[in-house]
Curated annotation (Swiss-Prot):
Required for the assembly or recycling of the small Tim proteins in the mitochondrial intermembrane, thereby participating in the import and insertion of multi-pass transmembrane proteins into the mitochondrial inner membrane. A zinc finger (CHY-type) spans 10-90. Zn(2+) 2 binds at residues 67, 70, 85, 88. Interacts with the small Tim proteins. This is Helper of Tim protein 13. The keyword Zinc applies. Zn(2+) 1 binds at residues 17, 19, 40, 43. It is a peripheral membrane protein. PANTHER family: HELPER OF TIM PROTEIN 13, ZINC FINGER PROTEIN. One of its GO terms (molecular function) is zinc ion binding.
Length: 114
């Protein structure tokens, strides 16, 4: 099975980018508008400047997060339940939760970000 591609202004093969490149910055997030994984919101905006469409965090039909180390794709619930990859045990940046609204929406929020 082919591994999903991660887009962005990447600085390594583990999904770190020009904007977020600390030791724990090893995830990428799927954007609904592109149906692709981007290292961060800024990378998405700079590379594909269109209205951002977000997935609902409760959508279990499509993986929304990918581990940049082992490339495991996971649901938002699987990702947010732990601060590490369930497959390779790589640690995730706990500060990412401060930006969930840039990537995901809740049931009562609009899909698009302007």
């Amino acid at each position: 099975m082919e591994k999903a591609q991660i887009y962005g202004k990447l600085v390594d093969k583990e999904s770190r980018c020009e904007h977020w490149h600390g030791p724990l910055d090893v995830i990428a997030l799927r954007f609904k508008c592109c149906n692709g994984y981007y290292a961060c919101y800024e990378c998405h905006q700079e590379l594909v400047p269109h209205v951002t469409e977000r997935y609902n965090i409760n959508d279990e039909t499509v993986p929304l997060v990918i581990c940049g180390v082992c490339k495991l794709e996971m649901s938002f619930a699987a990702y947010s339940d732990s601060l590490q990859c369930p497959n390779c045990r790589s640690q995730f940046n706990p500060g990412c939760k401060l930006h969930y609204d840039m990537y995901f929406m809740k049931d009562d929020e609009p899909e698009n970000l302007r």
